[in-house]
Design a protein with these regions (language model features):
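Basic, Lys/Arg-rich DNA-contacting stretches centered on the C-terminal catalytic core
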Residues: 104-106, 110, 125-126, 146, ...
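Short, small-residue-biased leader/transition segments that mark boundaries at the very start
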Residues: 1-5
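Charged catalytic carboxylate motif
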Residues: 8, 12, 35, 56, ...
């Protein structure tokens, strides 16, 4: 190869990302850019493409052995995409990613579905609170977080023989501002989901009280921002019986204190707040619970 093809890895990574910008969402592109800068450009960026060997690739992957399997797989995919693209453009005579194993990283923590008792306790604890509608939709329709936060009433069909939700939009956050898109995660994500009577009744009640076009909305009727959703979910975590940290001033100094609530006890400053949730629960776990119940139905 002549000097005309002398291209540094960092330069070609930037070009590859530019080529992807026409095909992927801005959020996906941001994720690619961050991962590429941290795990590909840092160790390999100053090298010329044709000078990179299989050993260089494997050495670059070593720090990822202690990271999650998901991150390992993502970096592996990006490396292969970049070098196979360079090979197709005839910038390489030899592709150093050939034979690179996709297996590596630490396996993710297993997500356990909630039991029927845990579901009942969770719903009883947050009934009447801001996260209740979100939790009901996730538990009884299996929608992803971004699908629930982007759900509008024109896709909720309650007055038909078999009530259902039609997934046609997705939410994402850009600079902590909600963006609603008709571009879904996959083709299969565009689907109609029958819903049970308990969710139908819940949604009917919510619909009667709201003027917003969004099923889950802020007080102004707008879709939630990322920070607003975190505050909504705080209603769940603050009712956990896990140790809670708080800070107080003692003799003019800020001191960190830890309290471990007993199940059923009340918060001193807010007697209405009951510490009742003695298990871990995340938004994704609600969807996992729905899918698990479908499998065993």
């Amino acid at each position: 190869l002549g000097d005309v093809y002398k291209r540094q890895v960092a330069e070609y990574c930037e070009k590859w990302l530019l080529m992807q910008s026409a095909k992927v969402s801005s959020g996906t592109l941001r994720g690619y850019t961050q991962t590429m800068n941290n795990y590909i450009v840092k160790p390999l960026g100053d090298m010329y493409l044709e000078d990179v060997t299989a050993d260089d690739i494997r050495l670059a992957m070593i720090p990822l052995a202690s990271k999650s399997a998901g991150l390992y797989s993502k970096v592996n995919m990006l490396l292969k995409c970049v070098f196979y693209s360079a090979e197709r453009s005839q910038l390489l005579e030899y592709n150093p990613c050939e034979g690179l194993s996709a297996k590596g990283g630490k396996p993710g923590k297993k997500i356990n579905a909630l039991t029927d008792e845990q579901v009942k306790l969770l719903l009883d604890t947050v009934r009447g609170l801001p996260p209740y509608t979100f939790i009901m939709i996730a538990l009884y329709s299996g929608l992803r977080r971004e699908e629930i936060l982007g759900l509008q009433w024109d896709c909720v069909f309650l007055d038909v023989p078999t009530p259902y939700i039609s997934v046609r939009r997705a939410w994402r956050s850009e600079n902590n501002r909600p963006v609603i898109s008709t571009t879904l995660k996959t083709k299969a994500a565009r689907r109609d989901i029958p819903i049970p009577k308990c969710l139908t009744d819940c949604l009917r009640e919510v619909k009667e009280k709201t003027e917003s076009e969004y099923v889950v909305a802020d007080r102004n009727g707008n879709p939630l921002s990322s920070s607003q959703f975190q505050r909504v979910w705080k209603y769940v975590t603050v009712r956990s019986t896990k140790p809670h940290n708080y800070y107080k001033y003692v003799n003019g100094q800020c001191v960190k204190c830890t309290v471990t609530p007993t199940p059923g006890s009340h918060q001193k400053n807010n007697p209405k707040l009951v510490y009742a949730i003695d298990f871990d629960v995340t938004p994704h776990q609600l969807r996992h619970t729905y899918i698990t119940n479908l499998l065993y139905a």
